Amino acid sequence: METRYQRHIQLDEVGTTGQEKIKKAKVLVIGAGGLGCPALQYLTAAGVGLLGIMDPDMVSISNLQRQILYNEDDLGNNKALCAKEHLRKLNAEIELKAFPWALTHDNAAEHIAEFDLVLDGTDNFYTRYLISDQCILLNKVMVYGALYKFEGQVSVFNYRNGPSYRCLFPSPPQAGTIPNCSEIGVLGVVSGIIGVYQALETLKVILELDTALSGKLLCVNVLNHQNSILDFVKNQKEIDQIKKQGKTIPIENEDCFVDFELSLEQLSSNEKIMWIDVR
């Protein structure tokens, strides 16, 4: 008789031991939008034992173009609560926790401490740097993703004492210098591709695989399939600064939104980054 996770268990890299690791894992997904929705669906299906879902926003009609976990009946309702309801129907064996409010300086440590790993599905610098700094302080892995039109980025931070988000992006750009998807748009399926990549990297971390994107930034361009991997190194000074303060470094503008950190041209000017063409 087939079991729910039989296809996982048949893999040498997973097996019964790996599936047990997945069952015991605790993952917090912050942002149940374009990135969070596909990631949540696959992590739920994979059998992650505890999934936290945090998002203060309500489902709107413009979300349905890419946030396919929701439907028209969810319009006007909180995303975290709707996601929990839909995911429960996908896998009743796992525990789901909904947090229908925003991550803040006041609650970040408490929420992140409860989980092994944080999947960043946010769209603003304020929350992203808050997640990053708390993950450094609490020694938690952060799985990152971002979107821009037909492009996306994925990386894994703080894995096995590896580089952090601030090693790649030490400080946010000035407000208004980088637009968000509500201003420039994003192809819906790109959200799905990058969100699934985040779910994949999350499972790699849970399974303790050596191939996780630690110290590597995957840049995906679905329009022309010119994909690249950028190698970057750990900046201990940035990490030590966070640990010395013992708290997150505030972002001056809490409304500074972003869906894509830097263009490939901007990244290529960084001398600490090495490009690898993966076409």
Identify what each model region corresponds to.
Residues I30-G31, M54:
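Conserved N-terminal Rossmann-fold NAD(P)-binding element of oxidoreductases
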Residues L35-G36:
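Hydrophobic/small residue at the entry helix of a nucleotide-binding pocket
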Residues A45-L50:
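Conserved S-adenosyl-L-methionine
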Residues N91, E95-F99, L103-T104, E114-I194:
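E1/E1-like adenylate-forming module used to activate ubiquitin-like modifiers
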Residues N221-R279:
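Flexible, polar/low-complexity N-terminal or interdomain linker segments that lie immediately upstream
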